[in-house]
Amino acid sequence: MDPSVLLLLAVLLSLFLLLVRGHAKIHGHLPPGPHPLPLLGNLLQMDRGGLLKCFIQLQEKHGDVFTVHLGPRPVVVLCGTQTIREALVDHAEAFSGRGTIAAAQLVMQDYGIFFASGQRWKTLRRFSLATMKEFGMGKRSVEERIKEEAQCLVEELKKYQGVPLDPTFLFQCITANIICSIVFGERFDYTDDQFLHLLNLMYKIFSLLSSFSGQMFELFSGFLKYFPGVHRQIVKKQQELLDYIAHSVEKHKATLDPSAPRDYIDTYLLRMEKEKSNHNTEFHHQNLMMSVLSLFFAGTETTSATLHYGVLLMLKYPHVTEKVQKEIDQVIGSHRLPTLDDRTKMPYTDAVIHEIQRFSDLVPIGLPHKVIKDTLFRGYLLPKNTEVYPVLSSALHDPQYFEQPDKFNPEHFLDANGALKKCEAFLPFSTGKRICLGESIARNELFIFFTTILQNFSVASPVAPKDIDLTPKESGIGKIPPAHQIYFLAR
């Protein structure tokens, strides 16, 4: 054999051995898991069922804490209620970093409230919480905004008497309008072409991220990013959303009154001006753009999808619908809109909404975290920047807390006296320091929108209840509800 070929093989073998030794040195204290192949990681453990199915199967073999390799990238997976709460609550600071969602971060990188970590994230979260509270509790509270939107929804659905519709984008409209009123200072008509285009972009992004192709990109992003694929579609759609946000920011700048900020963007612009001499400020244009995109996206997709699943579940389980409507009729009647004060008087309806969130399980593998320092967890040393996946589905289907975890049963959230009971396994918004920023708004939206729909309409389908398929279109980072034609019949 040619000496130069032998030399090349020797160099490659040496590099491979160094890589393996380096890998063991860096990751030697991580929890055990399935043996990874070089570069491919645990690809062989995956099938068309995606990451969630893979993680649940591995939990059965390796326990509640194990390591998988997404391609060459090691990730620690946390399963079960107690494990997740121990990490995200008991070790909240250590696990407060944001992990990688490769396709989304090609554009967003580590900017904005969603993908930031460390001091940047703390600063943006503190500002966003205060600002959303200010515009949600001021002259027009979030409740008033939701009730106004609920009334608009009723009027829109009345137009479809006797005609079935897929409510996907209508439910997106109502949830998006709440966050738009806080962030952009305006609501949109349901027929506004630009608004519908923006909603379609977000829906497509969420679908692509959740697709099997999106999950494959997550495994091999370092290599696949150089080739055509799903990630380029996501980047293009993100950029269209950012173009709209940039246009809105410029309009805000042109009409800004420092004495009377109208919304989140105005308040951020004023903070930017205040800190313009601070070279280390986090209040710059990049963080504004990415924070607005994050809020717009998070405030629309999961809540609208939960509401969509809620209606599908009412179609499939009409006996539950009857009990909800009976409680609505007794507590609210038919002549006024539901209010948040009604919730404490309606334990069955509240339990049904909780069970819809649990059963629909819309963010099954949770959003990735990373540890921000070397962390000792359950006897394993997780080096700084280790990525962590808290599998929320494993809590929402935890048999230690739910008697029938794979069945839709509102009794999961009712005690022996019919009162709503709390459950520490109920983690649809995650938990700890990175719990969903908009949890309170989302819970309020779900209660008012859901009760308003069933107060005013009976739901029906051309398909028999037993034949309604709840299998999601996509299941990855999120779940995309299946499309069904639904009749909304005035009561």
From Swiss-Prot:
Transmembrane segments: none annotated. It catalyses: an organic molecule + reduced [NADPH--hemoprotein reductase] + O2 = an alcohol + oxidized [NADPH--hemoprotein reductase] + H2O + H(+). It comes from the Eukaryota. The modification Phosphoserine is found at residue 128. InterPro entries: Cyt_P450, Cyt_P450_CS, Cyt_P450_E_grp-I, Cyt_P450_E_grp-I_CYP2B-like, Cyt_P450_sf, Cytochrome_P450_fam2. It is found in: Endoplasmic reticulum membrane; Microsome membrane. One of its GO terms (molecular function) is iron ion binding. GO terms for biological process: response to stilbenoid. Its main location: endoplasmic reticulum. Its cofactor is heme. Heme binds at residue 436. It is a peripheral membrane protein. Its EC number is 1.14.14.1. Keywords: Endoplasmic reticulum, Heme, Iron, Membrane, Metal-binding, Microsome, Monooxygenase, Oxidoreductase, Phosphoprotein. One of its GO terms (cellular component) is endoplasmic reticulum membrane. Belongs to the cytochrome P450 family. Cytochromes P450 are a group of heme-thiolate monooxygenases. In liver microsomes, this enzyme is involved in an NADPH-dependent electron transport pathway. It oxidizes a variety of structurally unrelated compounds, including steroids, fatty acids, and xenobiotics. This is Cytochrome P450 2B9. The lineage of its organism: Eukaryota, Metazoa, Chordata, Craniata, Vertebrata.
